[in-house]
Every structure is written in structure tokens, then in C-alpha cells.
């Protein structure tokens, strides 16, 4: 109706008042404040204002943009732009949840996996190194970590999924930037929290403490904030136990990296095995090959974390796919926790096409639904255009999950080899079969600019890549026939491998044009 929608801002003051002194040209800019907004209402102006009379200035940390992404899917491209603006607007010396309502807090759970995806778009290393210090400083004497740090809001809920961000962000800094210092600096504090949670909340080898559940799953009604249908929600003990197991695997890696932690590896191994055994004993349904109440989240977590009995993985995955494709008609049904691993798990187990469907949907619930309804950032809720304004931010990034990671690693094929952190060796393995016709992406790594620009025309692939100095790449092509492949217009030599129906080249730094005919999709 032409009026501003401010009901969802709660009691945040959204009005700036300036009194003209009435002498010539006057220029005014507010200080010590920022507003999150899309539209502005002007009153008291003596003439009809024009856009030239006002300048909107972006207030965010001085962080370099490091990533670009474009594909053949316009919806995916706009989602990327929305993510860029949303992330950018929430960098304020710490990663906050929203820039507009009376909150603006650095919630840990919003960045558990989000920090990883953001690292492809922005050089966020310094920001997150500093944030780890904030988290460490907020830790209690007995080891507890808050849900918000710095702990302006003193939410010491002692759940697993939000405080666990302390560990996952350190892992992101190591994987993306080869930063070992954060592990050395924070290892003792992270272990202290692990031990604290075990001592206080581990009962019969299962983690009993959970606070938020799979936060913000798409509700059954467009007017609801949270789902009331129990079939949509995942058991908190299942979530917490699986996530705690996942964090123990990261801590085991940290212990191997950090000389002071090598004696702890046996501790993490033993605790992990106990939890895995108890987890499967309680939550795995042998008859149905599913976990808990068979939500997508209940199944995706044990799949992503390697907790499923080896001979049951394919069955559990089939169950999960059935839920996505049939029960939810090819749409998202996960909340903040499940969405962190959804896209990559679908691709890893061979359904990149289904992941692409989720990424390109424009009907509720989906990221594309936000775009279709005029969003220019990412909403707090999947139904942000209709939900109760009590909790309905129009600029949150927590629902991105692992989408941006999937964009870069699975669509563009720009992934750091875990064995050589910081993109010393790049794994270039796009899911060509997903359904896109082309992707053009770049990422400014610590070694330099990485480019991946591929285009498929029927059964022919043209792929232009750039590998920075002092780095190398494993390049995966959708063929097993080397005679169909040329690199810089030269036939492939004998120095290649065949791995799971893909031809793999190891290339040193440089720029290449790869042509592959008769490719498999």
C-alpha cells in the first residue's frame, strides 16, 4: 500500500530527524547509527524529492570481496546476489544476525556453516579470527560457551549446536586459509567445552541437552513462525548427539595438528565410538532404514557425519530422497541445522540434480521463493512475506545453510583439498550432471585467483580454468576416454587417472582450456 513495513523491527528506532537551518545547500549524514532497510519514507520535504537528493551508504567492515558466481540459472544468480548483500550488511566487527530490528546480535548458530560459505565471497579470515577471541573471552570458568558472543545477551544455554560454532569456525579458518594458529590458540578452550558438555549432559552416551532444535523448519502454514506439526521437527537428543559426534571428529583432527593435543586422540576416538553405538541403538530404525521420525534432518546428519552403518547408507539416503521428492514435493523441509549439510550430501550420494532442484525452486519453501517475492537479501523465515512480524527479519543469513559452499565446491568445482588446506591443491570436480548449462566463478585464495568457467553444449564440454602460482589442481572430467579430451588444444598424455567413471588430470599452476567430447551426464 506504499507504506513502510516496520512491524517486524520491534522497538528499534528507525527514524532520523534533521532540522534545516535554512541557509543555502545543506548536507547531513547520521552518525553512530546504522539502519537495515530497503525503502525510505521522507516527510517534511518542501519539494518533491528525487533519488539524486539522497545517498544510501553501506556500512560494513572493510573486507575485500573475493568471490564471483554466475550460472545459466537466473534464480540461482539472484540468490547469490541476495546472499552477498545479506552477508555484507551483517559484518559489523563481528558477524551479527540482522542489521535492522532491536537485536543485531552475534548468534553463534547463524554462522556454524555460514562462515564457511561466506569465505568464498569475502576475505573474512581476520573477522572470524577476532570472533573466536570473543567466544573464548565469553567462556565460563567451568567451560560453558554462550549462544551469543560477545555475551551482551547472556544466553548460556549449554546446548551443542550453537556453541559448537567455536569449533566449526576454527575448522573453516584452517581449511580455507590454512590457519593453524587459531587451532593452537583455542585448542585448550575448545577441549574444555567438549569435556564440560560430556560431564554435564552426556547420559548413556547420548547428548541430552538441546535448546533450539532444527531452528526455523518451514512451517505447515504460511502464517506460522515455527512448525507445530511434530512430523516436521527432529528430536533434540538426536540433533545434539549427532552434532557432538561431528565436533569430536573435528577435535580429533585438531589434536593431530596441534602438538599439545596428540595425547587426546584416543579420548576423542573412544568417546566417538560410544556415542555412535548408542546413537544407532536408539535412533536407527532397522526396519525402515531411517533415523528418528524420518525427517530429512534426522537422516542427513548421520549420513553427512559418517554415523550410518556402512551397509545401510544407500538405504538411508533413499529414504531421505523419498522425503524430499515425495513427501515435500521436491522442496526444502530442513531448518538451520539440517540445511547446513543438505546440498552437499545430496551431491555426494549422487543426486546433484535434486540439489539443483532445491536451489532453483521458486515456490514455497525455497530460496527462490524469497526472490520471486521481491527479496533482495535472505529472510529469517522461509515464509518471510506472510509470517507473524514478531520474528520475521528480512535480512538474515542463517537459512543459507551450505548453499554457497555447494555453489562453489559442487557447481563451480572450486574446493580446497582437505589434505592440503588453503587451496594449495584445488579439487575441481563440478557436478556437471546437476542440470546447469554453464558456470562462471572465481575465488581469490591465499595463493591467488582461481577461475572455473565451464559450458556444456549437448555432449561437449568447454572448461576454462586458472590455477594460481604455487598451487595445483585435480581436475575431474565426465568421461573415461582420454582420446575425447584436449588441454590447450593438445591431446592428453598418459598422465591421467580414472576414478569412478571420471578422467582425472593433475595440473600445475597456469591457465587452461579443456575440451571434452562425448561426455557422460
Model-identified regions with their sequence ranges:
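Repeat-solenoid scaffold signature
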Residues: 327-369
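Alpha-helical support elements that line or immediately flank enzyme active sites
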Residues: 1, 29-32, 43, 110-138, ...
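Structural helix-adjacent loops and short alpha-helical linkers that scaffold large soluble proteins
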Residues: 45-53, 76, 80, 119-133, ...
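Conserved hydrophobic/aromatic pocket- or pore-lining residues that grip, position, or stack substrates
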Residues: 40, 83, 114, 135, ...
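Helix-terminus loop motifs that line ligand-binding clefts
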Residues: 3-13, 125-226, 363-384
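The feature captures the catalytic groove of carbohydrate-active enzymes
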Residues: 7, 14-16, 21-22, 94-98, ...
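Extracellular/oxidizing-compartment recognition motifs
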Residues: 1-101, 109, 126-127, 146-150, ...
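Non-catalytic C-terminal accessory modules of carbohydrate-active enzymes
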Residues: 270, 353-521
